[in-house]
Amino acid sequence: VLRPLQELAATASRLSSMTHMSRQELEALAGELEKINAKHLDSRIDLPATQKELRALAQAINAMLDRINKAYSAQMRFVSDASHELRTPIAVIQGYAALLDRWGKDDPEALQESIHAIRSEAKAMEELVEQLLFLARGDNDTQPVKPVAFDLTVLAGEVLREEEMIHQDRVFLPRWGEAPIPVRADQGLIKQVMRILMDNSVKYSPPDGRVYLRVTAQEGYARVTVQDEGMGIAPQGIPHIFDRFYRTDQSRDRRTGGTGLGLSIAKWIVDRHGGWFEVVSREGVGTRISFLLPSAPASTEEEAL
């Protein structure tokens, strides 16, 4: 993150042989740059207005510093949040390991409880790590995206049947016609988005609440909508639901609330495909969340995004 600053400082030192500005002025600029490090990313270069050439350069550098500071802060916050999320399952595993060591040999009930809890926490950690790796690859632009032409209604049907198998006591209502709705996208990633939205609707809905899955076509786009009859989202929370590690209900148990990364992943996928999200929610009534993708003729040839 800080490498550009080091390069700028070196460049400023070399500029004295290439410009009519004095060596003293350029060395002063280089000195200001050298003072900026990870602990002082909020520092900015301040030069007198009379030094027009240097001032234009300083303004460009300050703008770059703003971007670096924002990216660095986000990175540090992400690492801090990830560490916090991993700390809890590790503590639970350690606690049950101690329980096993003390009582496991003589108490079958304690043995089974500990094994179940350790497996559950290990699975949660695995899911969290996989999601973190996905977002890291997305941030580094190394996450593969392999688009193919397919019918979005067929994919929605697959997701709906899977949800019905997993949550056999819930009511899922499909809403789409017989006409195909073709798109060109990474089928696995779009399926992942649908699963994330469906799982959230189930998670935040009462047992007797219905979940709707709609697929519709509009001019140039395909729309997928998941609607529930759940708790809804407070107006102040809607702008943050795609933030990493954000949970709409902070009081919920961590296992019920999930990792707080699902919607961040969903947004990355949809953004990468040139689409966007639309969210409508009312507390005590439910949430309707849609994502739109560019539509494509069924005969569209595969090509990389």
Where are these regions (language model features)?
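Short helix-loop "hinge" at the ATP-lid/N-box region of the Bergerat-fold HATPase_c
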Residues: 201-202
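Short alpha-helical segment of the dimerization/phosphotransfer core of two-component systems
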Residues: 120-125
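Conserved micro-motifs of the catalytic ATP-binding
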Residues: 140-145, 178-185
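C-terminal end segment of the histidine kinase catalytic
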Residues: 270-305
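Short acidic helix/loop segment immediately C-terminal to the autophosphorylated histidine
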Residues: 69, 101-108, 116
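A conserved beta-strand-to-alpha-helix junction within the catalytic ATP-binding
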Residues: 146-161
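Membrane-proximal HAMP signal-relay module
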Residues: 1-79, 97-101, 137, 244, ...
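Short helix N-cap motif at coil->helix boundaries in the Bergerat
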Residues: 152, 232-243
